[in-house]
């Protein structure tokens, strides 16, 4: 037997579904629109940040709060973001007891560092123990650094080492003179524990002191383990722990 079933309920359901869909679209559209607006604004912010990061430093001298004057050695093309990142990671993290004696930070690209160091009369072989990464000058109480933020091969420790040289200079009787590393107490420690801070530190008493300073700042427990007398000596000067 054939029955003609009413189609009213089916049509009603379709109508309700359509109305619900339209209502949802009406309700959700502002939310989606706000999301897209926020996403676009965020992407624009990232673009501007990247653009600012990649801008090349145009000034030869830079002033950053809490740091010595920064000198961009002429002939070097450095990104503003790289300089700020390097300073935040490896220089601002230095204790004030050694950073405060530094009067100038010269910076350059890694590819130019060797030529600059050689022109300044630096032994770029690091006393035959490797390759120089940075150096300090008693002429103007400055340090020279190569700005490399892509790799971490001990830059913070290297900066501590050079700042320890500056600390040593500051305790001398005048420009060009070492102070602490020429003193009787450090000379005795160097004589008795020459190799305790590594081969480079063994080259002379000035490097011995600078290596001990870097180790005291960055790896105090290791310095304690290799030479407690040297740790106590550095602690009497830097007073960090």
Residues covered by each model-derived region:
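A metal-dependent hydrolase signature that marks the N-terminal structural subdomain at the beginning
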Residues: 2, 9-18, 26-135, 139-141
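Active-site-flanking segments in enzyme catalytic domains
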Residues: 68-80, 99-241
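Generic early N-terminus positional signal peaking at residue ~5-7
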Residues: 5-6, 157
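Short, hydrophobic/aliphatic alpha-helical segments
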Residues: 2-4, 196
